[in-house]
Amino acid sequence: MSQENHVDVPRKRIRIDQSESSRNLERNGLEDEANAPSDLSGQKFYMTESDVGIDAFLNPNLPSIDGIIKARFTDFAVFEVDTDGNIVHLTDMEAHDPILSKATGDKETEDAKDSSNQDISNDQKAPSFKEQEPATLPILPNDLQSIIPKGIGNEFIQSLHKLSVGEITDPISLILPENTPPMDKGQRTILHQFIRNNFSGLESSTKGNGTFTVSKTTRKNQPRSRRDPRLSWKALGGEYCHFHLYKENRDSMDCLGKIARLLKVPTRTLSIAGTKDRRGVTCQRVAIHHVRASRLAQLNSGSLKNSTYGFLLGNYSYKNSNLRLGDLKGNEFHIVVRNVITPKEKVVEALNSLKEHGFINYFGLQRFGTSSVGTHTIGVRLLQSDWKGAVDLILSPRPEHTGSVKEAIDLWHSTHDAEASLRILPRRMIAESSILETWSRSGNQTDYLGAFQRIPRHLRSIYPHAYQSYVWNRVASWRIKNLGDRPVVGDLVYSTESNGLSQKSPIVDPEAPDLLEDLPVSSKLSARPIEEDEVNNFSIYDIVLPLPGRNVIYPKNETFDIYKSVMNEASLDPLNMSRKDRELSLPGDYRKLLVRPENMEFNFIKYDNMEQQLILTDKDRLENRSISVSSEVGKHTAVTLKFVLPSSAYATMALREALRTATASGDQRMLMPAVLKDSI
């Protein structure tokens, strides 16, 4: 590591005093998090931090801060930071597709080739025409509305849609009322372009008598210059339309699925660099193959205030490549902590400590799912080749189950009727549905491996990766508690050869299993142990810990004993991570032990009501809205934070270090009723 980039921690050592830490934990309901609600059997309704190895602080001597995070979804805003360091915002919702000239090989009569005519998998079937949502059907350009009556125009567009999706096969013609002058060449060009941009697989032409006709495109009747659709995409700038996705209180994958259904394309045509939190306001980049900006812009419903889908699209551009998981530098967070009653000087002390020293780079609770049964516990069974145990956990009754989910799971356990249970179970329960459907078809309810393998491959991969994260969390807690905040001999750092980049391995986003990418594993060693004569050349911020795998090395000190001890609890061996099943033969990876927020700033504001919005969103800015807040006047106090984290770090873990507050959603919900009552 170069000395000019080296930043050492202050010489004043942060004292690891577990007795004081325990008092802070107990005061906030974090000690063993035993206060988490449970059902009559004692099973907790949700996982807590200690369940997944999160039980240490970098600076445990700081006081706790009483406050609530994510009280409103607008209290948690996330903006992607692209690979060039630009913060991604939604600033322009207009599509600016140019009309292509004849020089590109396009003529007045041209097919409308795009990816909309690709096959759609069964679970992504677009609605039939009668089910089609109004926002998916385009409207005629303004230049044509003056000559084509509204009723005729609407009927023509509906016919175009039916022809495009195959509900009708005969060519259609645009019949204008008598005494209506024929369209001139410019108007016909606009109409050709409109059809090309909005409907797939159609060819429009003007006959000698002036009749405008549209038919299904056949390769046979395409001019040679137009058989290669890349000609027009090249003129636009590339085959991939990149855009910014702004969403409110929705999952990234949920939004992508909705976009795919509305456009009638497979979800695989869309790509992102990473998912963003559901409960929040977020903006990120998305790329889609062979769909033009003008089609995407139709999904905005024409109104910011009446966006029916919970998301908006904009900032369109065309590029020659898609996005891959990890194609970002990080994320910028804007966070509100409400109902802060801790003295201001204590809050400032805690936040300055976070700013200066950072936090333990734990995998947050999101990594382990939202259920009371963590994905890592299923991962253990898989690594043990205990297929029955894994399947039983997936189908286990859980205290948080309600409605049709509870009914279906209870029915399965009382009758073992897979077919009847499957009829009740919502399709969104993908893993459970896959298992029951397999058994319903085969009738062999002892084929646990076969049933598990029917779960989509990418979802299956989440389980063993979650166990890796669990082990990492446990070891990180021990490392900070027992070896402190200085490097010691045998700690691992990135090798100069790898330049701080971990070896390539399958990337799994627990919120986006369909986006798992198989990347080649590097043959180069990406980490090395610190030798005795170079300990002073490194700081605690250089230390990395491995995620267990067949291609990693482990610390050359007592930390390795902790890996063995933790994994021995599950009868697993960190030095024996190869498996016959490629999916379970994990290569491993490396992760920084500590992370410091970049560009961190915070402010105190006053407010009167918990429903009051305290930070502006991109949507607010597009609507020219403003928020009136004061630093002096108001019934309650809130703290607003702004900082940037690398893509692999969790903002909730940064907040945990500063606030000493449990970040589990269930713990936060328990704080809400009293606060809401007090705000009335």
UniProtKB/Swiss-Prot annotation:
This is Multisubstrate pseudouridine synthase 7. One of its GO terms (molecular function) is snRNA pseudouridine synthase activity. Keywords: Cytoplasm, Isomerase, mRNA processing, mRNA splicing, Nucleus, Ribosome biogenesis, rRNA processing, tRNA processing. The active site is at D277. Its main location: nucleus. One of its GO terms (biological process) is snRNA pseudouridine synthesis. Residues 206-216 have a biased composition (Polar residues). The gene is pus7.
